[in-house]
Regions:
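Nucleotidyltransferase catalytic core that binds NTPs
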Residues: 1-173
Length: 173
């Protein structure tokens, strides 16, 4: 099969924290398109989150450092604006459940009507369908095991935030 020129795609999210499901979507996007801009988004209308924006960027960079063709940057505003700034041909979104599709499809139609950018959906691996940043934060807060859900740098950062171990034998969540 002849290789096609690489395309750039934008993978936006709050990534609070970046987890293995996110990493899987980035890996799939690199394989399919060649270049991925992980857009760590700041939404001034939402609470600032557990992890400060600059640290979320750093954790995503550490988590994707082994992948070629990946750039991680912080963006504010709309994902379609970030896509334009990044020179992205598409926005990539990961899907875990039918509910994710319903929400993302509305956003995709809106984004396309605003700028013409299209959204590509990538399914998460079945063994990661249960992973969410919200659940990871809650489990980490109570000292539960998260090392199988997040890259090591993220587990360490959350252990530092909550002052509790993140991957020992404390029992399951």
């Amino acid at each position: 099969m002849a290789s096609s020129p690489a395309l750039t795609v934008l993978y936006p999210g709050s990534f609070d924290p970046f987890h293995n499901g996110h990493l899987d979507v980035v890996s799939q996007a690199v394989e399919l398109f060649g270049n991925v801009v992980v857009a760590v988004m700041h939404n001034p209308d939402k609470p600032s989150g557990l992890i400060p924006l600059a640290e979320r960027v750093q954790l995503a960079r550490q988590s994707t450092a082994h992948l070629s063709g990946v750039r991680v940057d912080a963006f504010a505003g709309l994902a379609v604006q970030a896509a334009a700034v990044a020179g992205a041909h598409f926005i990539v979104k990961g899907l875990r459940t039918p509910g994710d599709f319903e929400v993302e499809q509305q956003m995709a139609h809106t984004n396309h009507s605003v700028t013409g950018v299209r959204t590509v959906y990538l399914p998460c691996r079945a063994d990661q369908a249960y992973i969410s940043s919200r659940f990871i934060r809650e489990i980490a807060q109570y000292g539960g095991r998260i090392d199988h859900m997040v890259p090591a740098s993220v587990a360490s950062a959350l252990a530092g935030i909550f002052g509790k171990p993140s991957g020992g034998s404390e029992g399951s969540s």
